[in-house]
Design a protein with these regions (language model features):
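Active-site residues of response regulator receiver
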Residues: 26, 71, 99, 230-234
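Two-component/phosphorelay signaling modules centered on CheY-like receiver
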Residues: 29-48, 200-216
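Acidic, metal-coordinating helix/loop segments flanking the phosphotransfer/catalytic sites
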Residues: 49-67, 214-228
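Acidic catalytic/metal-coordinating carboxylates
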Residues: 51-52, 78-81, 236-240
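Hydrophobic/aromatic residues positioned on beta-strands within the core alpha/beta folds
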Residues: 98, 255-257
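Receiver (REC) domain switch/output surface
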Residues: 128-140, 146, 286-298
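CheY-like receiver
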Residues: 138-192, 296-322
Length: 322
């Protein structure tokens, strides 16, 4: 059973090596050499260095990579365009942008293209690059584990139903119901509660996309019970709100317009917040897609918990019958 948000995920797992593959793109030979040397120290990383986006695309056509690390300013196709094309070719790819000329616009553009992290050169500590690559690999591994867990859970339920034909009818019906609910959540699990702080425009965009949305003030205790909280960088209390919600129930999405403060965006990246560039022509698509993805992940997790409980109950009913 393929999860709709993990198309192509993990297809290279059987390639005969436990190493992760990193595609490194920079047109400065010295920088490229330093980065390659740093990452090559990791025994479980295979690094492929190239000097242009065009060279990177050739490799992406023939090989599956786990992480793309690219400079923003490249000859020919730029880093932002490369990330967008690479993610189109390999949707499971994690992408990290590197630049010596950071700006709010470049951060927003990188994340809109599909980047999940951002590094400003020169590195204060060369280990930053290694840490960012490791974090990207962990994010990808978590998605693979979620996908594999979903498949295994559905397989177990189907096998148990077949093996436990003599189980009491109520137990059979309960497990079949939860299995159907689980499969439904995998296919269409993008329902849940969404709260927006400080952006009437975001409320409208999400409602137009058929989400149930409530607009709340930043101090509202209801925020902690929401599934997804959308907050705008223009809200003066966004730092406090983000820190309060970190580690709590909601997923936090930060809206950032072209006039967003660069330090705010870099702090949001440090806090591992989901960042959405707003005020762009494609904003009406990007925000609903991000919220839909987060709600789908949550819906699957909840359905998996219910199915686990139903499996345990069914096993107990079989044991009692025998």
């Amino acid at each position: 059973m393929d999860l709709p948000f993990e198309t192509g995920e993990g297809e290279g797992e059987g390639r005969g090596t436990l190493a992760s593959k990193v595609l490194l793109v920079d047109d400065e030979p010295v920088v490229l050499d330093i980065c390659v040397r740093l990452l090559a120290r990791e025994a479980d990383l295979i690094v492929s260095p190239v000097g242009s986006a065009e060279e990177a695309l050739v490799l992406l056509k023939d090989q599956r990579f786990d992480v793309l690390v690219t400079d923003k300013n490249l000859p020919g196709m730029g880093g932002v365009e490369l990330i967008a094309e690479a993610r189109r070719m390999q949707p499971a790819l994690e992408a990290v942008m590197i630049t010596a000329y950071a700006s709010s616009e470049s951060v927003i553009a990188a994340f809109a293209a599909g980047a999940s992290d951002y590094i400003v050169k020169p590195f204060d500590d060369l280990r930053v690059l290694r840490a960012k690559v490791r974090a990207a690999l962990e994010r990808r591994s978590e998605r693979v584990r979620t996908r594999d867990g979903a498949r295994e859970m559905a397989r177990q339920a189907a096998a148990l139903l077949d093996a436990g034909r003599d189980a009491p009818e109520p137990a059979h019906e309960a497990l079949e119901t939860e299995l159907r609910n689980y499969e439904q959540a995998v296919r269409m699990g993008h329902t849940g509660s969404v709260a927006v702080v400080g952006s009437a425009e975001a409320v409208k965009v999400l409602r137009d996309a058929a989400f149930e949305v409530v607009e709340l003030p930043p101090y509202s205790p209801q925020l902690e019970s929401a599934d997804v909280v959308v907050v705008e960088t223009g809200d003066p209390q966004w730092h406090t709100l983000a820190e309060r919600l970190q580690g709590r129930s909601p997923d936090v999405v930060l809206l950032a317009g072209a006039d967003a403060d660069l330090s705010d965006l870099l702090e949001a990246i440090t806090l591992r917040m989901d960042l959405v560039g707003y005020g762009q022509s494609n904003a009406a698509r990007i925000l609903p897609e991000k919220v839909r993805m987060l709600l789908m992940r949550r819906g699957i997790q909840r359905a998996q918990q219910r199915l686990t409980a139903a499996l345990d109950t069914f096993r107990q009913s079989i044991a009692t019958t025998n």
